[in-house]
From Swiss-Prot:
It catalyses: 3-dehydroquinate = 3-dehydroshikimate + H2O. InterPro entries: DHquinase_II (IPR001874), DHquinase_II_CS (IPR018509), DHquinase_II_sf (IPR036441). One of its GO terms (biological process) is quinate catabolic process. Homododecamer. Adopts a ring-like structure, composed of an arrangement of two hexameric rings stacked on top of one another. This is Catabolic 3-dehydroquinase. The gene is DQD1. It comes from Scheffersomyces stipitis (strain ATCC 58785 / CBS 6054 / NBRC 10063 / NRRL Y-11545). The lineage of its organism: Eukaryota, Fungi, Dikarya, Ascomycota, Saccharomycotina. Belongs to the type-II 3-dehydroquinase family. PROSITE patterns: DEHYDROQUINASE_II.
Amino acid sequence: MVKKVLLINGPNLNLLGTREPEKYGTTSLKDIEQAAQNQATAKQDGSEVLVYQNNTEGFIIDRIHLAKQEGVGFIIINAGAYTHTSVGIRDALLGTAIPFIEVHITNVHQREPFRHQSYLSDKAVAVICGLGVYGYTASVEYALNY
């Protein structure tokens, strides 16, 4: 079982709770991160969830590289808009060979056509989208039992 999970959130996810609440809800990123960390703590087996958010592609790539050195066993990533554009993030995930779940709060397939393309989905262990913030809870549960 995985003991160390990295939860990565990309651009604009720092605005959760206030950004388009009709789409993304009113839960803040801080609340999502705290809930994920509490899930790990509740296992009482030394599991932990590290959290990271950045709006800059290169910093996200650097954080993925660092995860390998830290012994992270699983990544949960909501790459936001970079899902649809970033070969660099895809290559970083593949380069570390750390299994990952792609998560999105909204159902991207019910949105604009450009959001239907993901550079990550075909390499992800799973894709969770459209479950609201519960998608994070489900992802953490899966990752901690991987």
